[in-house]
Amino acid sequence: YKRGVTVQDAAGTNEFQDVQIRWGHKFSDKLAMKVNFGYLTGTDWIANSEKDKLNRSVFPGDYNHDGINIYGDEVATNIYGVAQAMIGLGLLPAGAEALVPSEVVSRTGYNETDMAEPDATSKKADWGVYYRPIDGSNLEVSYVGKWGTGKTLYQGINRYAIKNFLMTQHKLEVTNDNWFARAYVVEDDAGDSYDMTFAAINVNRRWKPDLNWFAEYVGGIVNGQLAGMNITQAHALARQTADTGRWLPGSSEFEANLAEVIQDPDLTSGAKFTDNSKFYHLDYGYNFDDKWDWAEVQVGGSVRSYSLNSGGTIFTDVDGPIEYQETGFYAQMIHREVDDRLAVTAALRYDESEYFSGQFSPRTVISYTAGEYKNLNFRVSLQTGFRTPTTQDLFIGLDAGQARLVGSAEGNPDRYVRDYGISAAGQALGVPATVTVTGADAYNNSYEASSVQAFAAAGDPSLLKVAEVDYVKPEKMQSMEFGFRGKLSRTFTVDAAVYRN
């Protein structure tokens, strides 16, 4: 054990400061402890691109503008359909739809700097207690805890303001010369984090519902056309009309409503996401080195149990936490011959998840060291591996605005259920005013998005192409490698490998 204190204080030109403190102490030959603490604060990178996500156009020239770092403009509709609905309700005279182009228009959004502050902070600490109860033995019992919280901006499928999040880990470990066992739990809390896209969408909707905004936009288009304006001028008048009285960033109305929206976890009216997920993990292993002379043998395994708890804001866990388990076992043997110049390694691992059949992943490596000074090494290896889908691959149920992400674990698509309103044009074709869609419909009863866009443009049903969506499954990999490493002189070393994955 070593004892001491380390203090570090760093700063940068972009209002950045980083402080690190470390402390360790050996109380006796049996007991020691260490503590680390870190604090970071600064100004985060400001994302301010207003270019459209798809065609990189610049607002306001694009009426259906979805800016990269503009939020709330994801809400869009075809204003010709709105005009038809208004005529049906008697809000526009018959024939007025002739003055309204069949174009998709998006609502006016807010910039990222309006939705979140760019300052970033990080506070973290860890501590450990280490105890060796038996004199002359390497048996050690230890406890390590980790804690972290902070604030930052995060880019995922949407842009998120991560605020006051909390993550903790607690680990208990017992080790000896030939074996070990460790168990730990990791838990997180999303704190006051929120989705900036839905924050902007729902601030807009609090000020003026989508139906009202698009109806006023259509009214502006009609008035502009009747006044002799060209279509570009009419669009400008329409947006000005629909945005009249809009809450501006910095106003008391905007700030008060934003504060309420980001504390509401219902994405139809708010933007907060909750996550109190955790997982428990156990590792264990035994080394038979001192038992057998003919080979080095190790065996072990692991168990991991998940508890996903986002209240339906991230996963499909509206009715309660989603729990599942993964297990794994491994064995490895190394046999040496020819004065330890030849080494043969054989390993086998078996992993199983509740949602997938068990997977074997064998590995074999043969290496030979040549040369009088053992300075030439040749190796050949055959390896297999796989990756089990992540918790999000399996259980996500996230509304991302213009897209919905639905994991494909057994039963997960059926748990994702949403009701959608149908446009007047759709209702004219006999479709009900609202339809209920599940994630299973997306997997089993859907068309490719590009073919739907082609159909919408041409009106030809033959352009529709049924989507064939595969359910997620473990990724598998096989690798073969031939390698050589040799020191050919005091100043020249060759390290080369040929492999195929």
What is the predicted function of each stretch?
Residues G12-E15, R107-G109, T113-S122, I162-L166, ...:
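Short sequence motifs at beta-strands and strand-loop junctions characteristic
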Residues Y1-K53, T121-K123, L139:
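Outer-membrane beta-barrel translocator/receptor signature
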Residues K171-F356, D495:
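Face-selective signature of the C-terminal outer-membrane beta-barrel domain
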